[in-house]
Structure formats: structure tokens, C-alpha cells
């Protein structure tokens, strides 16, 4: 490629400018002497600038447009379409990997949203938020942190579904100062308006309890002031009587494990129930002949109890009902209303009301004459299992799987005492005849004695090697206390110092229930080994031993 003429001209001009000037000899000039010439230092000649060459033009690649068909679509050859199908097709393994990646990404996004979600830490606020969202406030076995985690998942789900308006509204209600007022309101007890029959029942219970309490106090004062009354001697005699209790008879009660037993008020009939749903009435004292067989429950029977004033009896079942019977097998009433299976049943001392406990976290009070539900009592956070009435009739005690025992005033409907001490579910409670002691037994293998006057635990009995299924005071004066356990034993404890008096062993499986006759002469126990056992004391032998001891002393 030849250079341009303009480029040659510029190179020549540059060369002329860059050449050094020619120095004349100073001696040839007038007025100057001959001076040796000064030789300038040698410098390398400057390099000429490199000429800028223009860039060659860049040729753009030709654009190709696919032919367009008449209907507007792009024409493709069969070979091209087949090659495209080969590149687009994905294997099943790749699809599974992609699905796993998408799921992992979705889970990560959900976790990020959940972590960024504003969720209250106050348990009351969490419950209130769940109530407003229409969700269950508390699930079975749920703790505070689990409840908050469930609320977080619900709010995250609503956020993903795009229900932001509801979330923003709830959040505004939570951050407003009104939340503090709502929390203060929740601290106060809430009341549910009951029917007119409940008010009448409370008045009747109050009148009944005042009379019974007056009689009990007068009797206690008389025994204290009367010199002929020797309470210590009576206590020793009762404990000695209990110490010599032994197995009197045993019989199979059903084809399935037995769950409950109860004596009639005169001690002539023993009722037992079993997992087969059948309740049987046995003739005492040998329990070999059945008087009646009650077969109306559709599920397993969980408890049976006789009325304290007549020959009626009540049964509880897992079919969510309780039934009232006569001793001849006639069904009188069916009590329906519980939302889950029943656990225990108990008569009020007046014989007019029936209390039932259920796994729906409530216990209820029924009118046995009309079959109407008078009271639905909440208060336990988990299933309610045991129930008992004070002999005066003023108080009721309940226990449950929340490890608490609560005492209720039936005259006002208030929870007056909450006994905390068991570390596992409580299955049985029973009032002492003195009116101010309460015994409770539970899964922690302990039997605790509570004092209603001192409002605290009076004594802790390490009763058994397995859970305590039932506790029962001697019905006359509370001289001793009997406990049944899943360790296949029934233990008798002193009602004064709670020392072990006697251990009744003979069952081959879990002891489910026990009962004591009104005169304390016999103890009945039923077990999962399907047997009924009666324990009695040989009083004549004790009297003979005392006579022999007196003769020796003389």
C-alpha cells in the first residue's frame, strides 16, 4: 500500500525543523578574536512520529430472515424441527433434579419469609391472633413455643397466598396501644352466662352444704370435748383392722380388662365395668352371682359409681356419654354433650347432681332428674381425668393431664385453689371426710396430700413403683388412705402420719380401680387381669390376740 503525498510533505517539514542550525566561525566577524569553537553535546535525533493508519472497514455479517409463510408463520424444515426436539427434550432424572431444586428454593423462600414475619412473643397475644384467624387456640400437648411456631407458619402461608390486607390489619391492631388494654382485660376472669337452672342448683347446693358443714363441725366439737371419746384409740383400732386385711375372694369379672368398681351404700352390691362396655352388678359378699348386666354403651366403659342416697348408679364411657341406671338394669337417663371420651364420673353428696370429666378439657355437672346439663366448666389446659366432691357438697375437685389439681366452689362457680406439685398427669383426687384434706395421685408415682386451709402440699407419699391410678379415703373418719397402682399393688396408708400400714398384692396386672365399703370392712379392687378381688380383715383373730396379751400381762 503506497503512502499519500500529504504524508511525504509532512515528513519533509518535520525533517527541516528538526535539523540543527549551522554555526559560523566567530573569527571572521569584526570585533571578535579567534575563539576555539564550542562543540555542543551530542543528542540523539528525535524520532519522527509514526503516522496513524486508518482502520480498515469492518464488514457486518449478513442477516438472514426465515421465510414467512402465507399465514404469518415461520417456515421450518423437517430436519430443523427434529434437531430442536432433540435439544428440548429433558430426561426424567433432570426433571427430578429440577423439581428438587425448585422445592428447595421454595422452602428457602418460605423460611426467609417466616424469619422476617413479625410474630408476637407474648403467649396471650399469640392466642388472640390464632382466635382472630379462626384457628384452634391450643392443640393437644402444645407448649408456648410450639404455639408461636404454628402461628408463624400460618402467617407465612397467608403471606404467600397474597392475603396481605388481612396481615397488615392484624399487624396494625397488634402495634396499636390497644393491645396493652386487651392484655389487661384478658387477665381478668371471664364468665359464661349459665341457665336459670344453674342458679337454682347453686342456691340448693349452698343450703345443703351449710347444713352438712354445721353437722360435721358439731360432731367434731363433741368428740373433742367428750371425755369418753378417745380418737387415738379409734385410730389405732382402725389401722390395726386395716393391717390385717387379706384376700377373701377372687373372681373373673369380664372377658376384657376391668376399669372401675363401686360399692352400693349398704355394701350389698358391687358394680364393675370393663373395656367391653358392659357393666355388671354382683351380689356380695362372694361376687359369684350377677344381679344385672348393663349393655347400652357403644364403646368401652371407663368408670362406674353408686349414688350415695339411693340404689341408682352411673356409668361413663368412651362413646362420650354417661348413663344413669337402676339396680335392676333399667336405663333412666343418658347424658350427652361431651365432645370427647369420658374418663370419670362422680355423684354429688346430695344425690341430685352428677359430675363427669372428659378428654375435651372440661368437666360438666348434670341434673339427674331432668338429664339437663347445668354447668360446663373449663379451666384445664389439657384433658380432665379425675373428679371428686367434698362431703359437705360445697366444693368439687378436678385433676387432669396438665398435672394440676383444681378446687371449685360450686356455690359461686369460681376456681378457689390450684395445686401445683405433680410433675406428670394426675389421674385421681379424693376428699378426706374431715373436709379440708385432699389426696391426689398421678403418673409421677406419688400421692400428695393437700391442705385446703394452708393452701399447700401437706405431705408427699412415694406411693408406688408405677403410676397411681386411684386414691380413696376411708369413708367414716379418714383413718386410712388406699392407693391403687399399675405396679399391681394396693397400698394402705395411715391417715394421720401417712406411714405404710399394709400392701395388698395379688393381681397379675395393672390395678385400675378400688372402692371401700361404708363401714370400712371390705376393699374391692379390679385389674386389667380381668379379676375382682375382695380384701377383708379377720377381726375375731385380732380380739383373741388382744385377750391373750391381756391374760399374760395379768
Swiss-Prot record:
PANTHER family the record matches: PRE-MRNA PROCESSING FACTOR 4 (PTHR19846:SF0), WD40 REPEAT PROTEIN (PTHR19846)
Location of this chain's protein in the cell: Nucleus speckle
Keyword Nucleotide-binding among UniProt keywords: no
Gene3D superfamilies the UniProt entry points to: Pre-mRNA processing factor 4 domain (4.10.280.110), YVTN repeat-like/Quinoprotein amine dehydrogenase (2.130.10.10)
GO cellular component: nuclear speck; spliceosomal complex
CDD domains linked: WD40
Protein name: U4/U6 small nuclear ribonucleoprotein PRP4-like protein
Name of the encoding gene: LIS
Effects seen without this gene: Gametophytic lethality due to female gametophyte defect, when homozygous.
PROSITE patterns the UniProt entry points to: WD_REPEATS_1 (PS00678), WD_REPEATS_2 (PS50082), WD_REPEATS_REGION (PS50294)
Region Disordered, residue ranges: 48-99
Repeat positions for WD: 253-292, 296-335, 337-376, 379-418, 421-460, 463-503, 506-545
Basic and acidic residues bias spans: 88-99
Organism: Arabidopsis thaliana
